[in-house]
């Protein structure tokens, strides 16, 4: 399966039990900042934004004072899992980032998708990739 198929079929799919509800954007990005696959709607990010995200995984709490920035959008960092998941909120939407052995799985959502639904979609794929040694 190609990386693009993971994004299209496992991240940008309908939310289970909520036909027509799906993430706004999603991507799988290598920990070096190289894009493995992304939805057409995923924002163009700056290297320093990806560096900040990687620093927060290595030093949890790094982004809390300044917020998480991706594609010029600022998200308020909310409760995540230190070293494993970063979550951010902006208005009625937000972002979930799951770290795997080699990559970061991104999901961005807006209402009617809920934070919990985004977390479920992103973390399920992230956990699968971890199980596969990726």
From Swiss-Prot:
Bridged cysteine pairs (disulfide): 13-118
Alphabetized UniProt keyword annotations: Actin-binding, Allergen, Cytoplasm, Cytoskeleton, Disulfide bond, Phosphoprotein
Cited PROSITE patterns: PROFILIN (PS00414)
Pfam families xref list: Profilin
Superkingdom field: Eukaryota
Recorded GO MF terms: actin monomer binding
Subcellular location(s) of the protein: Cytoplasm, Cytoskeleton
Gene3D superfamilies named in the record: Dynein light chain 2a, cytoplasmic (3.30.450.30)
Gene Ontology cellular-component annotations: cell cortex; cytoskeleton
Position of sequence motif Involved in PIP2 interaction: 84-100
InterPro entries in UniProt: PFN, PFN_euk, PFN_sf, Profilin_CS
Positions of post-translational Phosphothreonine modification: 114
Record's comment on post-translational modification: Phosphorylated by MAP kinases.
Record's miscellaneous remark: The variability of the residues taking part of IgE-binding epitopes might be responsible of the difference in cross-reactivity among olive pollen cultivars, and between distantly related pollen species, leading to a variable range of allergy reactions among atopic patients.
Functional summary from the UniProt entry: Binds to actin and affects the structure of the cytoskeleton. At high concentrations, profilin prevents the polymerization of actin, whereas it enhances it at low concentrations.
Subunit: Occurs in many kinds of cells as a complex with monomeric actin in a 1:1 ratio.
Membership in a protein family: Belongs to the profilin family.
Protein name: Profilin-2
Provenance organism: Olea europaea (Common olive)
């Amino acid at each position: 399966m190609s990386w693009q198929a993971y994004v299209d079929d496992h991240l940008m799919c309908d939310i289970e039990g909520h036909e027509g509800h799906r993430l706004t954007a999603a991507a799988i990005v290598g920990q070096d900042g190289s894009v493995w696959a992304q939805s057409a709607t995923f924002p163009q990010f700056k290297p320093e934004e990806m560096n900040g995200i990687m620093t927060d995984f290595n030093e949890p709490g790094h982004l809390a004072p300044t917020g998480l920035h991706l594609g010029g959008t600022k998200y308020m960092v909310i409760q995540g899992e230190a070293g494993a998941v970063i979550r951010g909120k902006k208005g009625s939407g937000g972002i979930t980032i799951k770290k795997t052995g080699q990559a970061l799985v991104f999901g961005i959502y807006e209402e009617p998708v809920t934070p919990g639904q985004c977390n479920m979609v992103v973390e399920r794929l992230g956990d699968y990739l971890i199980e596969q040694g990726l």
